[in-house]
Amino acid sequence: MSQAISLTFPDGSVRGYDAGATGRDVAESISKSLAKKAVAVAIDGTVRDLSDPVTTGRIEIITRNDDRALELIRHDAAHVMAEAVQELWPGTQVTIGPVIENGFYYDFAKNEPFTLDDLPKIEKKMKEIIARNAAFTKQVWSRDRAKQVFADKGEQYKVELVDAIPEGQDLKIYYQGDWFDLCRGPHMASTGQIGSAFKLLKVAGAYWRGDSNNPMLSRIYGTAFAEQSELDNYLHMLAEAEKRDHRRLGREMDLFHFQEEGPGVVFWHGKGWRVFQTLVAYMRRRLAGDYQEVNAPQVLDKSLWETSGHWGWYRDSMFKVTVAGDDTDDDRVFALKPMNCPGHIQIFKHGLKSYRELPIRLAEFGNVHRYEPSGALHGLMRVRGFTQDDAHIFCTDEQMAAECLKINDLILSVYKDFGFDEVTIKLSTRPDKRVGSDELWDRAESVMMGVLETIQQQSNNIKTGILPGEGAFYGPKFEYTLKDAIGREWQCGTTQVDFNLPERFGAFYIDSNSEKTQPVMIHRAICGSMERFLGILIENFAGHMPLWVSPLQVVVATITSEADAYGLEVAEALREAGLNVETDFRNEKINYKIREHSVTKVPVIIVCGRKEAEERTVNIRRLGSQDQVSMGLDAAVESLALEATPPDIRRKAEARKAKAA
């Protein structure tokens, strides 16, 4: 056969291969050891089965230690789990089983739902199947054959999935031994390549197709890794996350609660609202001088949302509002705002704007409402009503880069104040479906790429990346992702350039040539959802909040009633210094008091007895420590007041002191 295929390898070398050569053939042509390690190939970046014929292009041989192999390991583990379930419980229907972040799941139609007690049995059977080391082989079936085979097996959900596959698209069937499933692929070479580093984690109910009108299925979640050490680290992280669950800590610290009458909306208790307001006050100070804080209505006529495009793009996630009474002269349909941006454009449009006034930066701590399915709600992390620390900058095209850099500096500074030093910034570029001309996108992406390069040069510890095709339909965006104390990543901040809304609403300013010109609109959020950010803080610190954020900073506890008067004096001195203080003069043993306040995560407990009252000292005990530090009252007040000062205020004070010197 002639050498009809040309392959370019990662080192730049080019080799020719016969037409029909597979990925495995290519790996074997390099070395037998590589062929043994290979699990898949990538042609021009697309991962494919080793058994697939290769085509001319850039080729990479993927082994288990390649990052891309992890998805294959998890995908194959999901298939093996499905086979194990059907071996253990014949007649169970398999439906869908995708790879998800940090693992995989599979939904099953079974008369009785799975329980946690079933998971060890399934894991044992999975190990047996993996040990068989059956090859993954692929067949392409006709639509009629696929429907007939699955119908004969009693797999009605698979028949429905076959019907949903577009005409002209291959129906791929993957075998592992005698067991097979409908699947797009790709897969590794055999079940043995999955390895033993897998774990089934939990069971749950899930509606077929996510529709509550459909039957309830039984879902099993699992995870898998290339190495056992990686699995062990992940399971340790899950255990830590369980201890840090903000919902449990929120109850223990008496911060907030949820109840059935208000699904997805927070009932803030006194202490929780104090933390929330501390966060808002901090953000307000960070915006002072650069932003105008505004407030747009929460309820607006649907016509405005039609103009903005939200009614067409986002209506299923919006709350519609009408007047409840029958005898009303206003039968219009309104909506609770899901976003602040249309309201901010109305404020910008109110009155003629000159180029000399730009940039105009409008900020709002706006209450927004978005419908989330009840099954998706998760404490403060996923709610239906929340507060956005939203801002919109209206600027000229020439000002866009400087504004993006200014926003970046603010975002990174805020994160640093809360102890988040590991931040990743990714630029999401144009999606296939978008508004605006290619010329506009070229310009915006060029500017933002330049901003990203500047960020890289200025911040050595900041990771950056590109997310091709992940931009919003109205413009490219930066996404800011934090890494918390146990290694989890949280996407919080965004900076988005918008070509769409200014045009839809006819926003303009008068330029230097006295012409009407459409402004560049930049959306930016730092925390994103303030509620979610607070949930992240609670979990990051495991409830042990920095003193300046803590809702109750100090408890003054006395050993004896003879020290109560002095305890009151200590508490008052701390309050005058600006700290949130409570007293505990109950007739209980001091160790009992300390244990109780430790559960509620009070960061500082000051212990006073007869000796301290006589010497005008205090014993300071920190949350999580068995040690006590004795200090004079005045020194203790000064030290704690400084520690409780927010970092932005402390920086300004230090700058003033340095300037005065």
Curated annotation (Swiss-Prot):
Its main location: cytoplasm. The keyword Transferase does not apply. Binds 1 zinc ion per subunit. Its cofactor is Zn(2+). SMART domains: tRNA_SAD. The keyword RNA-binding applies. One of its GO terms (molecular function) is threonine-tRNA ligase activity. One of its GO terms (biological process) is threonyl-tRNA aminoacylation. Zn(2+) binds at residues 341, 392, 523. Residues 245-546 are annotated as: Catalytic. It catalyses: tRNA(Thr) + L-threonine + ATP = L-threonyl-tRNA(Thr) + AMP + diphosphate + H(+). Residues 1-64 form the TGS domain. PROSITE patterns: AA_TRNA_LIGASE_II (PS50862), TGS (PS51880). It is found in: Cytoplasm. Its EC number is 6.1.1.3. Keywords: Aminoacyl-tRNA synthetase, ATP-binding, Cytoplasm, Ligase, Metal-binding, Nucleotide-binding, Protein biosynthesis, RNA-binding, tRNA-binding, Zinc. It is an enzyme of class 6 (ligase). GO terms for cellular component: cytosol. Catalyzes the attachment of threonine to tRNA(Thr) in a two-step reaction: L-threonine is first activated by ATP to form Thr-AMP and then transferred to the acceptor end of tRNA(Thr). Also edits incorrectly charged L-seryl-tRNA(Thr). Belongs to the class-II aminoacyl-tRNA synthetase family. Homodimer. This is Threonine--tRNA ligase. It comes from Rhizobium johnstonii (strain DSM 114642 / LMG 32736 / 3841). The gene is thrS.
